[in-house]
A protein has these predicted regions:
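Bacterial N-terminal signal peptides that target proteins for export
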Residues: 1-9
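Low-complexity, intrinsically disordered short peptide segments enriched in small/polar/basic residues
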Residues: 9-11, 27, 167
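C-terminal motif of bacterial Sec signal peptides marking the signal peptidase cleavage site
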Residues: 18-21
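Bacterial signal peptide processing site
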Residues: 23-25
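C-terminal, surface-exposed recognition/capping segments
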Residues: 29-84, 88, 92-94, 98-230
Length: 230
C-alpha cells in the first residue's frame, strides 16, 4: 500500500473532557529540580515520570520552542511528506509495521518506539531525556492524578497541569503545529515517542481552550517536544 492510499483512512481521536478557563497570568515562582542544564518537575505520578518545565528549543515554560516531525531531531522550514526523513520512493524506511489494520507501507521492522538517535529530546538534551510514551501522556492527563486548566503564563495561552498529590505543576503552551507550509494557532500539539497502529502516524497530545485529547497524526507534522526523564 502506498502513502497516497492512506488518506482515505480516518484519524483516531480520543474524547476529552472540558477544561475550566482562567484569564489571569500565572507568574508563580516554583522550586524545581535540574539535570543536564534543564529543569524538571516531579508531579508524584505512579510511574515516577519527571516532566521537563520547558519544550525543546525553549528557555522559558511559556516559549513554544522548536518543532519536530516524528523521528526527526532537528527543526526545519517545511514539514511535509516530501521533506520527511523516513519516506523514500513513497515508502516508509524506518518504524514500519504490518497489522490487521493495514498492509505494509515499506520494509517491515516492527519498531514502534523511537530509538534514542531518532528522539528529539535525547539528541538535543542528552541520554537521560526522552519524548514521552503514549502511556506517559495518558498518565499526565489522567484525572486521578492531575487537574488541568486552560490559562495564560506571561500572556501565552496553554494548559496548566497540577498534581493532586503534591501541588506541583507544568505549563504546556499552545504553540500549534506546522504542516505543508501552514501553521495552526491556539492549540498545543505535543509529540510522543510511540508509533500508532499505522506506520504513517504517531500518537500525540493535543491541548486547547475546549479540552485536551490524544490521538494519532501524520508523522511529518511539526509539533512541540516536551521531554521526560525518570
Amino acid at each position: 500500500m502506498t502513502v497516497s492510499k492512506f488518506f482515505a483512512l480516518a484519524t483516531i481521536f480520543v474524547a476529552a473532557f472540558t477544561l475550566g478557563s482562567c484569564s489571569k497570568d500565572d507568574d508563580e515562582e516554583v522550586n524545581n529540580s535540574k539535570a543536564d542544564g534543564h529543569e524538571y518537575v516531579d508531579l508524584g505520578l505512579p510511574s515516577g515520570t519527571l516532566w521537563a518545565t520547558c519544550n525543546v528549543g525553549a528557555s522559558k515554560p511559556e516559549e513554544f520552542g522548536s518543532y519536530f516531525a516524528w523521528a526527526e531531531t532537528q527543526p526545519k522550514e517545511m514539514y511535509s511528506w516530501g521533506t520527511y526523513k523516513w519516506l523514500q520512493d513513497n515508502e516508509i524506511t524506518r518504524y514500519c509495521i504490518s497489522s490487521d489494520f493495514e498492509s505494509s507501507y515499506g520494509t517491515v521492522d516492527d519498531k514502534t518506539e523511537l530509538l534514542p538517535e531518532d528522539d528529539a529530546a535525547t539528541v538535543n538534551w542528552g541520554n537521560n531525556w526522552r519524548l514521552p510514551s503514549f502511556e506517559q501522556i495518558n498518565e499526565l492527563v489522567n484525572g486521578k492524578y492531575t487537574n488541568i486548566e486552560w490559562t495564560t503564563l506571561n500572556g501565552v495561552s496553554g494548559v496548566k497541569i497540577t498534581s493532586k498529590k503534591n501541588g506541583k505543576s507544568v505549563f504546556l503552551p499552545a504553540g500549534g503545529d506546522r504542516y505543508d507550509g501552514f501553521s495552526s494557532e491556539g492549540v498545543g500539539y505535543y509529540l510522543t515517542r510511540t508509533l500508532s497502529i499505522s506506520s504513517l502516524r504517531a500518537y500525540y497530545l493535543c491541548v486547547d481552550s475546549g479540552g485536551w485529547g490524544y490521538g494519532d497524526i501524520s508523522r511529518y507534522f511539526g509539533q512541540s517536544a516536551r521531554p521526560v526523564r525518570k
